[in-house]
Structures are given as structure tokens and as C-alpha cells.
């Protein structure tokens, strides 16, 4: 009887973490290199991180690959359900419900709120726009994560309208 045992390391799938961002309805959020200076207000991101989607600057909330492979973003779609929604092209704007996300292969992203879509929000209101993405280790391993952008309402300036009246004498 001949027994063959194959020894070696297989490829372990990467682990993608969910990402969050917070933005005012009339703003643009830019995230790169794990740095996010655009966060507005206070927001609890426990269990999630607010750096680029491949952020390795955090010790607890970062995308990982047990094999040490270099990670890159392979695809992006609208919606919170992984692999569904409208497919986007990396490096190009993908329109969500309340704005546009531009996600690059290196994990950096920009989200620009659509003022028209979010204008009805009052100061205390907020809505979310969710996108899902696939991260790849370049060796066949993939995992999915989401980017959830919270859009905060602002105190919109009043709009004055001209009044017209007719008086009959």
C-alpha cells in the first residue's frame, strides 16, 4: 500500500472588516492610508474601522491575511448584501442612494453626498448609504466587507420667495 501525504501550506482567505464613515449632507468624505480627518460629530464605530478598506494601521480593526499576502480590492457593488446590487468599476464613481462612492484597488475611497438626494434631511436626521466590496489576496483567497456611510442632515438656510399680490379698486 502506497500512501501519499501532501505537505505544504494552502492559501488562507483574507478577512475583510466592515468600514464606516460619517459625513454631512453637503460634504465629501475622503479616506486614504487609514487616515480619516473628515469625520463629523460623534459616531460609535465599535467593531468597525473608519480608515481605508485595507487599513492596516489599526491593531484590532483591520483587514488581514494569515499568509501575509498583499491585499487589494477586487470589486465593489451597491447595497449591503455581498455580491448583489449594481456593480461598479474600481476608480470610478458608483452611485448609491444618497451619493457616489469612488473606491480604488488600494482601498482608499471618496464618498460625495448628493445634496439633492439628502437635502430633505433635518439637522437631527441621518440616513445610510451602503456598498459591499471584495478584497483579494492575489492567490485566489477573497472575502467581502461593507462600507456604510452615514449622512447627517444639516440646518439648511431658509429660501425666500417673492410675494405677488393684486389689489382691485
Predicted regions and their residues:
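Acidic, turn/loop-rich segments in luminal/extracellular domains of secretory-pathway
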Residues: 1-10, 86-154
Amino acid at each position: 500500500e502506497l500512501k501519499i501525504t501532501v505537505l505544504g501550506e494552502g492559501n488562507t482567505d483574507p478577512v475583510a472588516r466592515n468600514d464606516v464613515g460619517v459625513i454631512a449632507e453637503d460634504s465629501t468624505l475622503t479616506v486614504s492610508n487609514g487616515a480619516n480627518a473628515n469625520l463629523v460629530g460623534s459616531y460609535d464605530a465599535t467593531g468597525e474601522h473608519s480608515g481605508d478598506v485595507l487599513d492596516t494601521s489599526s491593531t484590532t480593526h483591520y483587514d488581514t491575511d494569515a499568509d501575509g499576502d498583499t491585499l487589494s480590492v477586487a470589486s465593489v457593488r451597491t447595497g449591503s448584501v455581498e455580491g448583489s446590487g449594481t456593480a461598479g468599476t474600481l476608480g470610478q464613481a458608483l452611485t448609491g442612494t444618497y451619493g457616489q462612492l469612488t473606491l480604488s484597488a488600494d482601498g482608499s475611497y471618496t464618498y460625495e453626498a448628493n445634496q439633492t438626494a439628502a437635502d430633505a434631511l433635518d439637522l437631527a436626521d441621518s440616513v445610510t448609504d451602503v456598498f459591499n466590496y471584495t478584497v483579494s489576496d492575489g492567490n485566489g483567497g477573497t472575502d467581502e466587507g461593507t462600507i456604510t456611510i452615514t449622512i447627517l442632515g444639516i440646518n439648511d438656510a431658509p429660501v425666500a420667495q417673492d410675494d405677488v399680490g393684486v389689489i382691485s379698486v
